[in-house]
């Protein structure tokens, strides 16, 4: 998949504000601060397309980006961040859960997992949620360049054991660009 154009389309704080469109949606989900916005920026070649922050919980809305005028990339709020009010966590969970379970336009969910922490319970719960709702999903291991070779092997084994239905697993480094072409090739299969 070659990305020729990528533009911000809209942000939604509620499900009723989602775009009325038949364009396929490729959704990016993961724990807070896993690198969703950074990945979107490196995939599209636009440094400031999605706002990034070192502060977990920066993305608080469902953010839509139009890609090549033929599909959306959707950046969801991160899950698992404890330093926000309980009510805010509940609202994020309701928004994220409602979107994934109800949105017909979703063609693929890309689950980002921090390769340094591949066995987090919240990531396992997300995989179970995606499988329950029969959503096709792939896994992107972020921050992969920070692992030693021995750790890389352990991470891939761990993931294969609890994500049997994943369409793909891609190692990704925003710094080196490792995994970018592989991920774009995978995404091409879900563009409609």
From Swiss-Prot:
One GO term of the biological process aspect: division septum assembly
A cellular component annotation (GO) from this entry: cytosol
Domain EngB-type G, chain residue ranges per copy: 22-192
Keyword Coiled coil: no
Sites where the protein binds GTP: 30-37, 57-61, 75-78, 142-145, 172-174
Superkingdom to which the source organism belongs: Bacteria
Keywords in alphabetical order: Cell cycle, Cell division, GTP-binding, Magnesium, Metal-binding, Nucleotide-binding, Septation
Cited Gene3D superfamilies: P-loop containing nucleotide triphosphate hydrolases
Keyword Oxidoreductase listed: no
Annotated positions binding Mg(2+): 37, 59
Cofactor(s) the protein requires to work: Mg(2+)
GO MF term (any one): metal ion binding
Database matches in PANTHER family: ENGB-TYPE G DOMAIN-CONTAINING PROTEIN, MSS1/TRME-RELATED GTP-BINDING PROTEIN
Family: Belongs to the TRAFAC class TrmE-Era-EngA-EngB-Septin-like GTPase superfamily. EngB GTPase family.
Function recorded in the entry: Necessary for normal cell division and for the maintenance of normal septation.
Stated name of the protein: Probable GTP-binding protein EngB
Organism: Prosthecochloris aestuarii (strain DSM 271 / SK 413)
Lineage: Bacteria, Pseudomonadati, Chlorobiota, Chlorobiia, Chlorobiales
Encoding gene, per UniProt annotation: engB
